[in-house]
Amino acid sequence: MTQQTFLVEIGTEELPPKALRSLAEAFAANFTAELDSANLEHGEVSWFAAPRRLALKVANLSAAQADREVEKRGPAIAQAFDAEGKPSKAAEGWARGCGITVDQAERLVTDKGEWLLYRAHVKGQSAQALLAGMVSNSLAKLPIPKLMRWGDSDVQFVRPVHTVTMLLGAELIPGTVLGIDSARTVRGHRFMGEAEFTIDNADQYPQILLERGKVIADYETRKAMIKRDAELAASTIGGKADLSESLLEEVASLVEWPVVLTAKFEEKFLAVPAEALVYTMKGDQKYFPVYDAAGKLLPNFIFVANIESKDPQQIISGNEKVVRPRLADAEFFFNTDRKKRLEDNLPRLETVLFQQQLGTLRDKTDRIQALAGWVAGQIGADVNHATRAGLLSKCDLMTNMVFEFTDTQGVMGMHYARHDGEAEDVAVALNEQYQPRFAGDALPESLVACSLAIADKMDTLAGIFGIGQHPKGDKDPFALRRAALGVLRIIVEKNLTLDLQTLTEEAVRLYGSKLTNAKVVDEVVEFMLGRFRAWYQEEGHAVDTIQAVLARRPTKPADFDARVKAVTHFRTLEAAAALAAANKRVSNILAKSTDTLNDRVHASVLKEAAEIQLATHLVVLRDKLEPYFAAGNYQDALVELADLREPVDAFFDNVMVMAEDEAVRVNRLTLLSKLRELFLQVADISVLQ
């Protein structure tokens, strides 16, 4: 069967830059699934994405589906006909579904009986007949949060569509997609190359777009060009460009023909904290800041134009004029804010609502101040500095700088606190209180900063759960999942001695009578343990390993971490599987028993050699492992417990647990209970698969 290249390009208005990659990747994935579902053989599916187009190119696409043999078994003969030999309703319904009458059906005879059978040779449809519908289906499934209409059409898409091109080799595939008829015409760059031109063959794409339209359709090529040229431009002025992945992706999504240029701003603006300048350059203007070898911001920036100009200096001057007022605003705000102390903003926090039922930001500040001090006392941080940081934690939200440049919250608090002469760890804590902001983000460095970060997040968790506004599905408006994981990461990775139970109780206590959910403490702790499960699964720990530990409900995160790692190591031991199975057997035996167990194993009642041996091992191990458990050394404890495999196997091979003699039976059950208790000091390994 002949195979050809298939091309589809959707020409649009400017697509959302932050969604461009995900739209293109989803388009490719959806279309690949359509091809596979239709049994159309194909090679690689490549995607292309630029500001005004989404495209796919499929290599070696079959011209048609393969022919296939279809067999559908119907009702058994006994149910297919009545006593008079007339077809039953079941038989007629089945035949109708197959497009035949009952008397046209074949018979399938096996040693198990006889059934009606429909057998047919189905000729494969041509790709030409299928492709337009498959493209439409693929586009309809794109992850578009908000659709729009244009003109007088009812068609909806992420942006208005102007052209649709579908080619199978040199053949134009007819069809209407998103209200536009398929044609050979594609559009080039707005200001360079040919405005419109036709494509004769799918294999010409994307080269023809490059040559005639001055559009680089390959997303990764544009991104690599920008990265390479920006690095070169920065090194030319003796610096290094801040090419963050997210901004690099966004800029690559904004241009069809990237031209990297270097500009500068007045050195006087460097007196403003670099974070504010960078926020303006990256967030507002999509510029790449440049730093020197020591990491100090230079009075230069790199930007990407979407046109190759005969007079690039004019474009450079234009961008310098655009950014200057924004930098001047930052300078003005910085100087104005410093005319009063950070602490002077406290009264204004009373005018801003944190949450209707939970009070103002000033109320939140008071709670954070108290909780940060409590946490500091638990982890050995400077309590006075932690409470001071708590008091100042939200003051920068009232400054001109943060009001205008919202992403500078925290970092501006740090700069203003330093200006006011606050202790350095207090100032740094104001910046680090929001860390970690995202997966993989850095944690607060000092214990004072950890105290504040934990207090801020726990106050939010306790408050929102306390009024019953739990995260539901994908909706998490207060970012409680991120807050919970942040607290857990800080405690685990900093190895802090904090208990989630008492921490949550303290956070709830500070709300007084504001909270209406009586189960708030338990629900917050369970929610955080659930975050543990998700986190450790991502880290590669087996689900049943995590469940084994969660069965013990350890509320100290550092302790939870040690237990999970211990069980993960235990599973590598040769004895692990047998001991897990034995624990499961013990658990089942104890669950079914109605006997009241003894407080201890009575040596005088032990009869069999195997039970005496097991009891002796347990006594020795119990005493030996006590300091291991006390120190949280669970890994070595489980290694020691692995030595129980032979005596446990011998016990089950040679001892009848449910003996008729009640004293013997209860003593043996007690022995098994003590065995299980020893393992439960670490985890419930009976749940291991």
UniProtKB/Swiss-Prot annotation:
Alphabetized UniProt keyword annotations: Aminoacyl-tRNA synthetase, ATP-binding, Cytoplasm, Ligase, Nucleotide-binding, Protein biosynthesis
Keyword Protein biosynthesis: yes
Highest taxon listed in the record's lineage: Bacteria
One biological process term in Gene Ontology: glycyl-tRNA aminoacylation
Compartment(s) of residence: Cytoplasm
EC numbers: 6.1.1.14
Database matches in InterPro entries: DALR_anticod-bd, Gly-tRNA-synth_bsu, Gly-tRNA-synth_heterodimer
Pfam families: DALR_1, tRNA_synt_2f
Principal place of residence: cytoplasm
Example of a GO MF term: arginine-tRNA ligase activity
Catalytic activity: tRNA(Gly) + glycine + ATP = glycyl-tRNA(Gly) + AMP + diphosphate
GO cellular component: cytosol
NCBIfam families (UniProt xref): glyS
Assembly and interaction partners: Tetramer of two alpha and two beta subunits.
Family: Belongs to the class-II aminoacyl-tRNA synthetase family.
Protein name as it appears in the record: Glycine--tRNA ligase beta subunit
Organism per entry: Serratia proteamaculans (strain 568)
Name of the gene: glyS
